[in-house]
């Protein structure tokens, strides 16, 4: 597997709509950067979040997930994640991953250096949709996540050949997701 460069990412974004909307360069302007980078793409988080809380003393169960476990917040500026807590968000960008590509996502250093961990599971070949982002506040302090700014870098890996079975072929349960998507079994 090889990591795609900015040239390859740009070509796939323009010719195959791999990333939409696609920002052809790094944008800063007083914001946490987003857009095309040397060997990846810095995606933005949208303005809707699900912030976990323990008001009802419930248990988080991925097989029987309850909406009592979180509150939904919409903000064009930022949200605050309580200390040692967790939130979900979604990318502004829609991703359409080609059959011979997979994607690994890592958090941006700006957030990592403030105790915010951005986690995303691997994005498989032929996935299509927005990507749900997981934020963990590992600090004993409240932490801000800025809406409509960069949060994670997507690294695109090209396989030595196309897979026998893609995410689309398997009819993956998160295929075509839009917005913050909760766990499915």
From Swiss-Prot:
Alphabetized GO MF terms: dCTP deaminase activity; nucleotide binding
Keyword list, A-Z: Hydrolase, Nucleotide metabolism, Nucleotide-binding
GO biological process: dUMP biosynthetic process; dUTP biosynthetic process
Binding sites annotated in the UniProt record for dCTP: 108-113, 132-134, 153, 167, 177
EC number: 3.5.4.13
Reactions this protein catalyses: dCTP + H2O + H(+) = dUTP + NH4(+)
Physiological role: Catalyzes the deamination of dCTP to dUTP.
Subunit structure as annotated in this protein's UniProt entry: Homotrimer.
Family assignment from sequence similarity: Belongs to the dCTP deaminase family.
UniProt name for this protein: dCTP deaminase
Name of the encoding gene: dcd
């Amino acid at each position: 597997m090889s990591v795609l460069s900015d040239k390859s990412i740009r070509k796939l974004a323009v010719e195959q709509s791999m990333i939409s909307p696609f920002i052809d360069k790094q944008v800063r302007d007083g914001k946490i950067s987003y857009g095309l980078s040397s060997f990846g793409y810095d995606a933005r988080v949208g303005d809707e979040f699900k912030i976990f809380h323990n008001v009802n003393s419930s248990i988080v169960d991925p097989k029987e997930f309850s909406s009592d476990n979180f509150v939904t917040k919409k903000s064009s500026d930022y949200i605050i994640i309580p200390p040692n807590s967790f939130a979900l968000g979604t990318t502004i960008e829609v991703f359409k991953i080609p059959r011979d590509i997979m994607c690994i996502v890592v958090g941006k250093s700006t957030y990592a250096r403030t105790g915010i961990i951005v986690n995303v599971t691997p994005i498989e070949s032929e996935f299509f949709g927005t990507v749900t982002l997981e934020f963990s506040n590992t600090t004993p302090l409240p932490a801000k996540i800025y809406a409509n700014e960069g949060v994670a870098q997507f690294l695109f890996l090209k396989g030595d050949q196309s897979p026998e079975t893609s995410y689309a072929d398997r009819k993956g349960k998160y295929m075509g997701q839009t917005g913050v998507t909760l766990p499915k079994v």
